[in-house]
A protein has these predicted regions:
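Surface-exposed coil loops of outer-membrane beta-barrel proteins
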Residues: 110-133, 171-186, 194-302, 482-487
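Extracellular structured ligand-interaction cores
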Residues: 94-96, 138-142, 156-160, 182-184, ...
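Short, solvent-exposed loop/turn segments that connect beta-strands within catalytic domains
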Residues: 152-153, 194-199, 241-242, 323-324, ...
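Detector for outer-membrane/organellar transmembrane beta-barrel domains
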Residues: 237, 242-246, 262-263, 269-448, ...
Length: 505
């Protein structure tokens, strides 16, 4: 009995202890689970925070990327606009450089220097030029710098300066004999938006310049008309679709401009009208007290010099060879009285008498005459009376013809024949003597070009030439200081040889 009770008590005690121990373990596990759950929650919170930060960073990256792309697009757009503006500016404004030059060497058949030049004959003193091919030994250069711009309102501006120099020496250093000078410096204003009616599209100008509508006969190195000086005017006043006019006032000086007592200036007022191919120009000239002008020694220069004058030109500018065939041609009839009797270089001769009268005709043309040939004939003739002294007379006529034979695209043979007749009666002026007679010149010139071989007006050219010239013996007596009759050239004929370059652009 005792043993059974004891055993029961022992079992009860053991069972209670185990139960208490189990309850203790469950509480610990539960606490641990709660702590673990808390840590998991905290980890989840931290992960969520990190995820939120990552999403925020990604959004910022996307925003930055978008902004960068926008900036790139803006930069590209600005660059495109800038390029367009720069291109537009380049199209509207810019500098230009143009020029003319010739230079060459010439010798006679003895290997010595010889006389040459388009104005070497006695008639050359009054403008009687002869063919220039194979007849020039000088170096002459013109350099033109221009700046042009077009404003947003459509108005245009143009500034031009021209520097030129001429030399007859073959040396490379020629400062002591230089004729370097500024021949042009002027400004033009065109298409002014406030100009209306006939003045719409016209061009104002002022400064020192060659007149825009001068023209010449290149093969004899002679201007048909050369109006130049310092002044101002207006071009292209349009009265209707076919009639336009130019108006200008030029000033020139006579005599030594460094002489403080010389105040004589020649003013030239010009009206120049164009109707289709026709040109009509009228000019009035005035040089107050020209007959009282004195030299640097105080001596009267010319007591019968003219103080006024008139000049007129009637021209025809064809885009065909005298209306007969393809090509071009220009013809002009000129008249001058008093100061206007120097009909080529208007207003350039202050020694003309008030009764001086001059008539001149000039004409030239160019045309192809076969597959490989082109021809350019020219005529220049003048009659001038009472020019420098009462009763004097200067009459002459030049006939010139140049031919080009194309050999290939870079080589041609050029031929030129020039004939001049003159009947000069200076009546003792400047110790000149009355003469009459003829001058002849023939030239053969193998010529190299880069292209447009048959075009009379394309350059540059390099020529090798030989020329034969002769004159009437009577012309030797005209003067002691001109080319003809001097030790360098006499009647009887002379051969000359040389080479020359010529260019313009």
């Amino acid at each position: 009995m005792y043993r059974k009770s004891t055993l029961a008590v022992l079992i009860a005690l053991l069972t209670g202890a185990a139960s208490a121990h189990a309850q203790t373990d469950l509480s610990t596990i539960e606490a641990r689970l709660i702590a673990l759950e808390k840590r998991l929650q905290e980890a989840e919170n931290r992960a969520q925070t990190a995820e939120n930060r990552a999403e925020s960073a990604e959004k910022k990256v996307q925003q930055l990327t978008a902004q960068q792309q926008k900036n790139q697009d803006t930069t590209q757009e600005v660059a495109q606009r800038t390029a367009k503006l720069e291109k537009k500016a380049d199209e509207k404004s810019g500098f230009e450089f143009h020029g003319y030059a010739r230079s060459g060497v010439i010798m006679n058949d003895s290997g010595a220097s010889t006389k040459s030049g388009a104005y070497m004959t006695p008639a050359g003193e009054t403008g009687g030029a002869i063919g220039r091919l194979g007849n020039q030994a000088d170096t002459y250069v013109e350099m033109n710098l221009e700046h042009k711009q077009t404003l947003d309102n459509g108005a245009t501006t143009r500034f031009k300066v021209m520097v030129a120099d001429g030399q007859t020496t073959y040396n490379d250093w020629t400062a002591s004999t230089s004729d370097l000078n500024v021949r042009q410096a002027f400004v033009e204003l065109g298409n002014l938006p406030t100009f209306a009616g006939p003045f719409k599209g016209s061009t104002l100008w002022a400064g020192k310049r060659f007149d825009r509508d001068n023209f010449d006969i290149h093969w004899i190195d002679s201007d048909v008309l050369f109006l130049a000086g310092t002044g101002g005017g207006i071009y292209d006043v349009k009265w209707n679709d076919s009639l336009r006019s130019n108006f200008s006032l030029y000033g020139r000086n006579f005599g030594d401009i460094d002489d403080s007592s010389n105040s004589v200036q020649n003013y030239i007022l010009t009206m120049n009208h164009f109707a289709g191919p026709l040109q009509m120009m009228v000019s009035g000239l005035r040089a107050k007290d020209n007959d009282e002008r004195k030299d640097t020694n105080g001596n009267l220069v010319k007591g019968d010099a003219a103080n006024t004058g008139v000049h007129a030109l009637l021209g025809l500018h064809n885009d065909s060879f005298y209306g007969l065939r393809d090509g071009s041609s220009k013809t002009a009839l000129l008249y001058g009285h008093g100061l206007g009797a120097e009909v080529k270089g208007i207003g350039s001769d202050g020694a003309l008498r008030s009764g001086a009268d001059t008539w001149r005709i000039a004409s030239y043309g160019t045309t192809p005459i076969g597959k490989n040939w082109s021809i350019a004939p020219a005529i220049l003739a003048q009659s001038s009376k009472d020019r420098y002294v009462d009763g004097d007379s200067y009459q002459w006529a030049t006939f010139n013809m140049r031919l080009i034979q194309e050999i290939n695209q870079n080589f041609a043979l050029a031929y030129e024949g020039s004939y001049q007749y003159m009947d000069l009666k200076p009546e003792g002026y400047n110790d000149r003597h009355a003469v009459n007679g003829s001058f002849y010149k023939l030239t053969f010139a193998p010529t190299f070009k880069v292209g447009s071989i048959g075009d009379f007006f394309s350059r540059p050219e390099i020529r090798f030439y030989t020329s034969w010239m002769d004159l009437s013996k009577k012309l030797n007596n005209y003067a002691s200081d001109d080319a003809l009759g001097s030790n360098g050239f006499n009647s009887g004929g002379e051969w000359s040889f040389g080479m020359q370059m010529e260019t313009w652009f």
